[in-house]
């Protein structure tokens, strides 16, 4: 019997994926024994309980479910490798699929133990959760209609003459606001899966996302393409580059610290590099991961 526990207060959008496969809502509810939340504070608590809950936002290539319900992606695979080094087997990971905007509130409410969504480290987020050291670094990208008839090659281009879609809770909102995009020209979608239809139907003129995400989406439909070449946005004189990491509840410092120790060792290996290359990350993006620390990113 699975160790899955579901809170009565868990958001309806969340889905639990025991042992890497999607569990139906009915099956999950049948396993409900109490309103006990996840929220493990220490690694020893996780081991004593027998499982760990990890939330993902179904975003390629970071962490997503394939057509068979298997959880895949660079973030998910790194989490598996690191946790295995800490004595937690992959089959003892309970995956939770939710929206990106629900990740931090879910951590704060102890609905899961950690996230594996490549969430960019930002000072305002550091006030709400704690992060591991970075395990990814990425620039920006943009999805446009096939042929790019309006010749969009930067967020600034769209800011001046079009509507741009972003995922709810994503960093791109901050960028659009800094670039002066009017609120009425910002289209918010719930998940990356909605990006192709938003652009293909003309609801939005472009979709702003991490470069790897935009590139992956472009491969999925002949109605859209990646805007190339693309110029990363410049805000306050700085080219925008993000560093992503795993996040934890603020009370879970012991769990985060133990995870960090194993992550930093794994980050030095060729296996780590090959894993990211296998998901389409550029060598220069992988090389940039150690350039920033979580402490620096939280304070700047």
Curated annotation (Swiss-Prot):
Organism classification: Bacteria, Pseudomonadati, Pseudomonadota, Alphaproteobacteria, Hyphomicrobiales
Family: Belongs to the bacterial solute-binding protein 3 family.
InterPro entries: Ectoine_EhuB, Solute-binding_3/MltF_N
UniProt-annotated location(s): Periplasm
Gene3D superfamilies recorded: Periplasmic binding protein-like II (3.40.190.10)
Pfam families xref list: SBP_bac_3
GO CC, alphabetical: periplasmic space
CDD domains in alphabetical order: PBP2_Ehub_like
Its biological purpose: Probably part of the binding-protein-dependent transport system y4tEFGH for an amino acid.
Protein name according to UniProt: Probable amino-acid ABC transporter periplasmic-binding protein y4tE
């Amino acid at each position: 019997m699975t160790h899955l526990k579901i809170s009565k207060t868990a958001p309806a959008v969340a889905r639990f994926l025991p042992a890497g496969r999607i569990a139906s809502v009915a099956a999950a509810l049948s396993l409900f024994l109490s309103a006990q939340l996840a929220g493990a504070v220490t690694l020893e608590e996780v081991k004593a309980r027998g499982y760990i809950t990890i939330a993902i936002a179904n975003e390629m290539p970071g962490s997503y479910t394939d057509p068979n319900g298997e959880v895949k992606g660079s973030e998910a695979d790194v989490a598996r490798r690191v946790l295995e080094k800490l004595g937690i087997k992959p089959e003892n990971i309970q995956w939770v699929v939710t929206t990106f905007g629900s990740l931090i509130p879910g951590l704060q409410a102890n609905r899961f133990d950690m996230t594996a969504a490549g969430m960019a480290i930002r000072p305002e987020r550091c006030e709400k959760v704690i992060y591991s050291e970075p395990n990814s670094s990425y620039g920006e990208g943009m999805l446009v209609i096939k042929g790019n008839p309006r010749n969009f090659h930067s967020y600034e281009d769209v800011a001046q003459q079009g509507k741009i879609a972003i995922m709810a809770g994503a960093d791109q909102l901050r960028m659009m606001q800094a670039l002066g995009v009017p609120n009425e020209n910002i289209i918010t979608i719930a998940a990356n899966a909605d990006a192709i239809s938003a652009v293909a139907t003309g609801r939005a003129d472009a979709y702003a996302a991490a470069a790897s995400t935009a590139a992956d989406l472009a491969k999925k439909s002949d109605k859209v393409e990646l805007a190339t070449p693309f110029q990363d946005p410049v805000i306050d004189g700085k080219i925008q580059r993000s560093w992503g990491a795993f996040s934890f509840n603020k009370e879970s410092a012991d769990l985060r610290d133990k995870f960090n120790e194993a992550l930093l060792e794994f980050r030095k290996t060729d296996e780590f590099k090959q894993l990211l290359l296998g998901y389409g990350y550029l060598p220069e993006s992988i090389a940039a991961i150690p350039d920033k620390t979580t402490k620096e990113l939280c304070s700047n």
